[in-house]
Design a protein with these regions (language model features):
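Extended, low-hydrophobicity segments enriched in charged/polar residues
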Residues: 1-106
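Serine/threonine-rich low-complexity intrinsically disordered regions
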Residues: 4, 20, 25, 30, ...
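Long, positively charged binding patches that form subdomain-scale interaction surfaces
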Residues: 70-149, 161-162
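C-terminal structured domains
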Residues: 116-248
């Protein structure tokens, strides 16, 4: 079980505040780590993760804040997505994992500054067109290992199948091994917290689940025991052509 974070600054008061549209940023985090003291914090669910909103002064946006500003959560999401696309460069580049699962790629926001109310690295997972363009270029659907908020690894389904053939294993066996690897990282993370409580604030765990991206439908699915977990639902990503001027 991931320990919930408790180091975030509490609001000095509960009064709603004016939201500056040019300062709204998205963050992605495991829902267990999102501060629990204010149930009104706006969270957009994506499996066991939560997308939440912060402003330039690092305040998390709540229900009362969007009501005060007469803005919907949907509009806030659109504003934050488009703002970040304009301000940050996102890349997918070759990488290696510790146990060399397969040929890996890593999502990265090149010029993000976490201290300046920037998005965390993992939120690039939901940027319009990012996974779609990469998947089309690779001619393959994708498997995603959301190791933590800084390291989100991508594997092509084509390469996973190639690994299965080379090692004479079923795809289910390889995917279960990926799930076990992720679980081991979570256990190591929790054990490290026992030794160094600050470690959980450096690179928090993101998800318990391996994800599958279908490029035809532009949707994410969660895996369980090497197969798509139909009970977990799906998360539909925005198409690239949804980007538009919304900051005015």
């Amino acid at each position: 079980m991931i320990r919930p974070a408790d180091d975030y600054d509490l609001y000095e008061d509960n009064k709603p505040f004016s939201i500056r549209k040019d300062k709204v940023t998205l963050r992605l985090l495991n829902k267990e780590l999102i501060p629990p003291w204010n149930p009104n914090i706006i969270i957009r669910n994506i499996f066991d993760m939560g997308i939440y909103y912060v402003t330039g002064d690092e305040n998390m946006i709540r229900e009362e804040d969007i009501e005060f500003n007469n803005i919907s959560e949907e509009k806030l999401y659109e504003i934050a997505i488009n703002k970040m696309i304009k301000e940050y460069d996102i890349t997918i580049s070759p990488a290696e994992t510790e146990n060399k699962i397969a040929n890996a790629f890593l999502l990265n926001i090149e010029n993000a500054n976490e201290c300046n109310s920037a998005p965390n690295n993992c939120v690039s997972l939901i940027y319009p067109g990012i996974l779609k363009n990469f998947a089309e270029k690779q001619h393959s659907n994708l498997y995603i290992l959301p190791l933590n908020i800084e390291y989100v690894y991508i594997f092509t389904e084509t390469d996973i199948k190639r690994k299965c053939k080379a090692e004479n294993k079923s795809k289910k066996e390889v995917l279960i091994a990926m799930e076990e690897y992720l679980q081991k990282q979570i256990e190591d993370y929790d054990n490290k917290v026992e030794i160094d409580i600050l470690s959980r604030y450096r690179i928090p765990i993101l998800s318990y689940k391996i994800l599958y991206y279908n490029r035809t439908y532009n949707e994410l699915y969660a895996l369980k025991n090497g197969k798509i977990d139909k009970t977990a639902g799906k998360y539909e990503l925005l198409p690239e052509n949804k980007q538009k001027e919304v900051l005015s």
